[in-house]
Amino acid sequence: MKSLKIKKGDRVKVIAGNDKGAIGEVLSVDPARERVVVEGVNIRKHHRRDMPTPQGGTTKGGIISSEAPIHVSNVQLVTKIDGKDVVTRVGYRRVDVTKRRPDGSEYAAQRSVRYLKKEEAK
């Protein structure tokens, strides 16, 4: 399974497709299919019928709109710099951290940390 640089909660801009130029928050990520669901983008309508519930009632049917997944290559990360939305890329760097063992002793280790390249250039 491929590791994606886009994570849930990121602000992204759609760079291809019918919703090109739209900016929204990532609601979910599917790394196996390399797809992301972006808030307010790729809206699809689902026709649902009235369904009985186990409690004896019914859930109301109708036409329900929801976001459909889009391929991760069609989105790019967005960050706010000086109040403007700026598209950026993602980089990873190694950071020294101190970890603690269950017996209380500490040791030095490294952790990979994600950062936005445009924010780094500032």
Curated annotation (Swiss-Prot):
One of its GO terms (biological process) is translation. It comes from the Bacteria. Keywords: Ribonucleoprotein, Ribosomal protein, RNA-binding, rRNA-binding. One of its GO terms (cellular component) is ribonucleoprotein complex. The keyword RNA-binding applies. One of its GO terms (molecular function) is structural constituent of ribosome. Gene3D superfamilies: 2.30.30.30. Pfam families: KOW, ribosomal_L24. Residues 43-64 are annotated as: Disordered. SUPFAM superfamilies: Translation proteins SH3-like domain. The keyword Zinc does not apply. PANTHER family: MITOCHONDRIAL RIBOSOMAL PROTEIN L24 (PTHR12903). NCBIfam families: rplX_bact (TIGR01079). One of two assembly initiator proteins, it binds directly to the 5'-end of the 23S rRNA, where it nucleates assembly of the 50S subunit. Part of the 50S ribosomal subunit. Belongs to the universal ribosomal protein uL24 family. HAMAP family: Ribosomal_uL24_B. This is Large ribosomal subunit protein uL24. It comes from Cutibacterium acnes (strain DSM 16379 / KPA171202) (Propionibacterium acnes). The gene is rplX.
